[in-house]
Swiss-Prot record:
Record GO biological process: isopentenyl diphosphate biosynthetic process, methylerythritol 4-phosphate pathway; terpenoid biosynthetic process
Gene3D superfamilies: 2-C-methyl-D-erythritol 2,4-cyclodiphosphate synthase, Spore Coat Polysaccharide Biosynthesis Protein SpsA, Chain A
Species whose genome carries this gene: Wolbachia sp. subsp. Brugia malayi (strain TRS)
Designated name of the protein: Bifunctional enzyme IspD/IspF
Residues holding a divalent metal cation: D246, H248, H285
Length: 405
């Protein structure tokens, strides 16, 4: 299962890998899922991990004094995957057995504290992790767990009939991540008693487990309703907005032959030429930048550097095709596009219909969703002196099914 096109597990693991108090992360996986785990590690950026059947992972913290609350790395997690992300460990037949196997695997590291988190809680926040870690490090508790107050009425039900109502003032819903003294938790797991979570195991052995405030957003994906709620919260936005801008200088045309400039893919006869590395279509360049900006994919210069000879005199429709393909690959299509062309000459109005037709055909959208406007600067500035031409573009993209090869 994925959220925002990424495995559920990846969201929680990323938070743990980037947290300042976490020294190591180890994921417990089903032995039949190792290939999927490895493939995901190799293929995804930012060290996202693939989903595992046993939906939890371990992180360890070394003891730190109060004045030593400093990040593990000031550069973040990038480049540290080999040292911070440990190799996965196979789980057992039950959650508790998998926890025990994970704890056993950490003996060589011998951390002071261990954090156990359900990966099916993708909304764990750095604030929550930090609060738990500080409480544990500062007070040397045996265990610290997050919990939220129970706000609904709680009743005992038998055969769909309410038998009694339970006072809720002292009731709490326990969440993860949960932090414990590593050696004590491991020793109690070796007793092989069955418990629903690790805090229950510690309490059974008369150990004090401190409760701190949890977060409602840190809910567990258990039912279909939970999953639908998570998708609403975490899936990519349905719409994206981008803007683009481009400007080019006019230069004198050489010779007596007719000269043309190209705007929105349409040739316009004019006694000047556009100085540019490509064909100088300012409007298309602005549109390309708007689409790339909406996608978070940089700008036209990053993909088609003017220093590269292969783009010399290149038809700008090639750049527009590229941007449209990028949008499809990321699962977006153009909802509507607004272009403003600013110049004193030539006159744009006679060509607007042809411009709309060219742009809409290239982007594979109806021409009614493309608007082309033209204006002047009332003789002000370099454009007013007819030294060049510029264009602005605004685009709205909407989410469609992503393109899979």
């Amino acid at each position: 299962m994925t959220l925002a096109d990424k495995p559920v597990l990846s969201h929680a693991v990323k938070k743990l890998l980037t947290n300042q108090y976490i020294d190591y992360v180890r994921v417990i996986i089903n032995r039949n899922h190792e290939d999927f785990y490895r493939e995901t590690i190799d293929s995804l950026h930012n060290y996202y991990l693939s989903e595992a059947v046993h939906s939890f992972q371990y992180v360890t913290l070394k003891s730190r004094k109060k004045e030593e609350w400093i990040p593990v790395s000031s550069t973040g997690m990038k480049g540290r995957v080999d040292t911070k992300l440990l190799s996965p460990v196979y789980g057992g037949k039950s959650r508790q057995n998998s926890v025990k196997l994970g704890l056993e695997s950490l003996q060589k590291i011998n951390p002071d504290f261990v954090v156990i988190h359900d990966a099916c809680r993708p909304f764990v926040s750095n604030t929550l992790i930090n609060n738990l870690a500080r409480s544990m490090i500062n007070n040397q508790h045996t265990g610290v767990v997050p919990a939220i107050e129970v706000e609904d009425t709680i009743s005992l039900v038998n055969d769909d009939l309410i038998e009694s109502t339970i006072p809720r003032e002292r009731l709490r819903a326990i969440q993860t991540p949960q932090i414990f003294n590593f050696k004590e938790l491991l020793s109690y797991h070796r007793s092989n008693k069955e418990f629903t979570d690790d805090s229950s195991l510690m309490v059974e052995h008369k150990k004090r487990v401190v409760v701190t405030r949890g977060e409602k957003i840190n809910f567990k994906l258990t039912t279909k309703e939970d999953i639908n709620m998570a998708k609403l919260l975490l899936d990519e936005p349905k719409y994206r907005v981008g803007t683009g801008y481009d400007i080019h200088r006019f230069i004198k045309a050489q010779g007596k032959a007719k000269s043309f400039i190209k705007i929105c893919g349409v040739e316009i006869e004019y006694d000047m030429k556009i100085e540019a590395h490509s064909d100088g279509d300012v409007a298309i360049h602005a549109v390309v930048d708007a689409i790339l900006g909406a996608l978070g994919c940089g700008d036209i210069g990053a993909h088609f550097p003017p220093s590269f000879p292969e783009w010399k005199d290149r038809n700008s429709s090639h750049f527009l095709d590229f941007a449209a393909k990028k949008a499809k690959e990321k699962g977006y299509s153009v909802s509507n596009l607004d272009i403003t062309i600013v110049c004193e000459e030539p006159k744009i109005s006679p060509y607007k219909v042809a411009m709309k037709k060219f742009i809409s055909k290239t982007l594979e959208i109806d021409s009614e969703f493309v608007n082309v406007k033209a204006t002047t600067t009332e003789k002000l500035g370099s454009i007013g002196r007819n030294e060049g031409i510029l264009a602005h573009a605004s685009v709205l993209l909407y989410k469609i099914a992503p393109l899979h090869n």
